[in-house]
From Swiss-Prot:
Recorded name of the encoding gene: proS
The protein's Enzyme Commission number: 6.1.1.15
Coiled coil: none
Any one GO molecular-function label of the UniProt entry: ATP binding
Protein name as annotated: Proline--tRNA ligase
PANTHER family: BIFUNCTIONAL GLUTAMATE_PROLINE--TRNA LIGASE, PROLYL-TRNA SYNTHETASE
Keyword NAD: no
Protein localization: Cytoplasm
Task of the protein: Catalyzes the attachment of proline to tRNA(Pro) in a two-step reaction: proline is first activated by ATP to form Pro-AMP and then transferred to the acceptor end of tRNA(Pro).
Length: 478
């Protein structure tokens, strides 16, 4: 791959660009011989590490990390009928131990409610045990029958963060839902990914939930990608799995629950929204390397330049930055290309003239040039990286704003969707009208109670029947 210096497909051909960038930037290898299972390259896995490190830091404020088994006994998995109805066609079953048939089939977790909640029933006895707030980051398996796509639609989700909480009352669980939404906002702000939050219609909520709040991002082709969900589970699962507590008056009460999930789709959105025709563009907070130093070595001062580059690397690393020094025997231009496609936010070029001037050329991933003072390298570099983050966030915000619109007619909705936009319409919340919107516009009714800084959510007449309606998000989805 080191000698592969051909141009990427243009990003306007998003599907081709996406598939190529995963390979060329060393994110994922798609050649594993099982459909829907992919291999992380070390470079891509480092990006994943920094993304999930930030997510862990947010969750650790009031959750405890744990780990539950991958295998779920059939009798536990089948307890919650409504929940199972949503997953039964996607389950992988383990039926043998070696050559011996198992007495009880074991499901590979598609999600972990039915693994975790029998244990909650053992852990919860008194109101003093509540609330419980745990999370795990694990792999999950779903027999995906649609076309698979790396990081977006998988048979093995390698990086599924699922949070599960238990509360004394429905209202306390609702407060937890809002807390998870706030956490999600902070997480995606760190990734410079604008999000749209909405309440999924009842027919599209998580199986067994009272309601589902979903988080969507608008991809470069105008399709929406669901990159997070928060579910208020009410007491459905606690009733099924007998999760009860004794209140202060000595009475037995059913608990109320929430669950919350983010998968590696967050990295798909990160790659897709920020990248350009040259490759990845990574926010400094999650870049494998935040800075690459390219020494320009000429003639007799070769050793002087390398020594100065090494000192610069040490100075920046001592300031907490992730830095790589590229001393390979390649032309500078080949090195520039190598690191551009991999999205390193800042390149520092250091040659003989720079040693004389006490400065180094600084080039951002998007091509802006300035200089840093070698005597003040850490402070100057950190300032540039802050500016890079702000610029990436602003550009992504403009993309989202330009791909959102409000329309009041079905013709207007068709035009918006065909232009690669996501539309806000008014809908009365009647299922028949919802089905009509989806069928006529060949789209998905994403949700009501729209929360976005990029568009105003108002009330108005339903786009189908004219009855009073609420702002509703409509788009084409992955």
């Amino acid at each position: 791959m080191e000698t592969d210096t051909g141009a990427l497909p243009k990003k306007q051909d998003f599907s081709e660009w996406y598939n190529e960038i995963l390979w060329r930037a060393e994110i994922m290898d798609v050649r594993y011989p099982v459909k829907g299972l992919y291999v992380w390259f070390p470079y891509g896995f480092a990006i994943r590490k920094f993304v999930y490190q930030h997510l862990r830091e947010l969750l650790d404020r009031d959750h405890k990390e744990t780990l539950f088994p991958l295998l779920i006994p059939e009798q536990e998995f089948m307890k919650e009928a409504e929940h199972i109805k949503g997953f039964e066609d996607e389950v992988y079953w383990v039926t043998h131990g070696g050559t011996t048939p198992l007495e009880v089939k074991l499901a590979l977790r598609p999600t972990s409610e039915t693994a975790i909640y029998p244990m909650f029933a053992l852990w919860v006895r008194s109101h003093a045990d509540l609330p419980i707030k745990i999370y795990q980051i694990v792999n999950t398996f779903r027999y995906e029958t649609k076309q698979t796509r790396p990081l977006i639609r998988l048979r093995e989700i390698t990086s599924f963060m699922e949070s599960h909480t238990v509360h004394a009352t429905w209202d306390e669980a609702e407060i937890q839902v809002e807390s998870e939404i706030a956490l999600t906002r902070e997480f995606y702000r760190n990734l410079c990914i604008p999000i749209i939050i909405s309440k999924r219609p009842d027919w599209d909520k998580f199986p067994g939930a009272d309601y589902t709040i979903a988080v969507d991002a608008i991809m470069p082709n105008g399709k929406t990608l669901q990159i997070g969900t928060v579910h208020h589970l009410g007491n459905h699962f606690s009733r099924t799995f007998n999760i009860q507590y004794e209140d202060k008056n000595g009475e037995q009460k059913e608990a109320y629950q929430t669950c919350y999930g983010i998968s590696e789709r967050c990295i798909a959105a990160l790659i897709s929204l920020h990248g350009d025709d040259k490759g990845l563009i990574l926010p400094p907070t999650v870049a494998t390397f935040q800075v690459v130093i390219v020494p320009i070595t000429i003639g007799k001062r070769h050793e002087d330049v390398l020594a100065a580059a090494g000192k610069l690397k040490n100075d920046l690393e001592n300031a907490g930055l992730r830095v790589t020094l590229d001393t390979r025997d390649l032309r500078p231009g080949a090195k520039y290309y190598w690191w551009e496609i991999r999205g390193v936010p800042l390149r520092l070029e250091l040659g003989p003239r720079d040693l004389d001037s006490g400065k180094a050329m600084a080039v951002t991933r998007t091509g802006e040039k300035t200089t840093i003072c070698l005597a003040n390298a850490a402070e100057d570099t950190t300032s540039i990286l802050t500016g890079i983050t702000d610029a990436i966030r602003a550009k992504a915000g403009e993309h989202t704003k330009s791909h959102l619109c409000t329309t009041h007619t079905m013709d207007g909705l068709d035009i918006a969707l065909n232009e690669g936009k996501v539309a806000v319409v008014h809908w009365c919340r009647d299922r028949t009208c919802g089905d009509t919107i989806e069928e006529k516009a060949n789209s998905s009714l994403l949700g009501t109670e729209v929360r976005s800084e990029y568009i105003e959510a108002t009330d108005g007449p339903c786009i189908i029947c004219g009855k009073p309606g609420k702002a509703t998000l409509v788009g084409r989805t992955y």
